[in-house]
Amino acid sequence: YVDEKVGLENTLIVLSADHGGPEAPPDMQQYGFESRYVDPESWEREAAFAALKERFGIGKPLIQQFNPPYVYLNRELIAEKGLSQGEVETAVAAELIKFDGVALAVSSTALTSGDLPDTPLLRSVLNNFSPRRSGDVYVVFSPNCFIREFDGSAVAVTHGSPWRYDTFVPVIFAGAGLKPQKIYREIHTVDVAPTLSALVGTKPPSGTRGKILVEVLEGR
């Protein structure tokens, strides 16, 4: 359709990704690297987690689901018991961070309040947090640790990871009039929107946070 109706000479193709593509644990292990799968379904069976539930008087499953990177708690059960949502979130995060394969666990209550240290890791977590849409506890797996099963498949990559191998992605502009070149400075995927706006001569979208990639404009 593009070839026939628009013409490639009038088309700009932009490619990127929403996460990286690291090697799977079996591949890394054969070269001597420490890497493993994590099984979130086992967390609630851990003795420490059982003790936490006993402390709160909870006899039913507390974790409703794990949709990376968020744990979703059974809010109806928490309310039924007359418990503080924030207190339960904080307690769950404190236990999860002790488990193998978990580098960080932060309650949504803490992320909402902003009462957290200003570190690169937590800044990355905050960039992926929305009080209205996010889960109850943000879980960051340790480097080279991946979820064992998601939607029926073992995976080596998923959303929400702040590590370099998962945040390093390509940004490719291809089209008539662009000069072939490679850019080695650090850029961000959010730079694509304002760059496209500059190319077509319009104002960038209201939610734009990126910067114009001047190399793309200079290459035309």
Predicted regions and their residues:
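C-terminal non-catalytic regions of proteins with extracellular/luminal or membrane-system context
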Residues: D3, S124-V125, F173, R209, ...
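Substrate-binding rim/cap in mid-to-C-terminal beta-strand-loop elements of soluble/periplasmic
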Residues: V38-G86, A156-L199, V214-R220
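Secreted, luminal/periplasmic, and some membrane-associated catalytic domains
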Residues: Y1-R148
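Short, well-structured beta-strand/strand-turn elements
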Residues: A103-L104, T202-R209
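Short, surface-exposed loop/helix-turn segments at secondary-structure junctions
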Residues: E149-V157
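Short, well-ordered loop/turn and helix-capping segments at boundaries between secondary-structure elements
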Residues: P22, Q30, K98, G177, ...
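Feature representing long, continuous alpha-helical segments
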Residues: T90, A94, S124, R132, ...
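Short, solvent-exposed loop/turn elements at domain surfaces
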Residues: F146-F150, P180-Q181
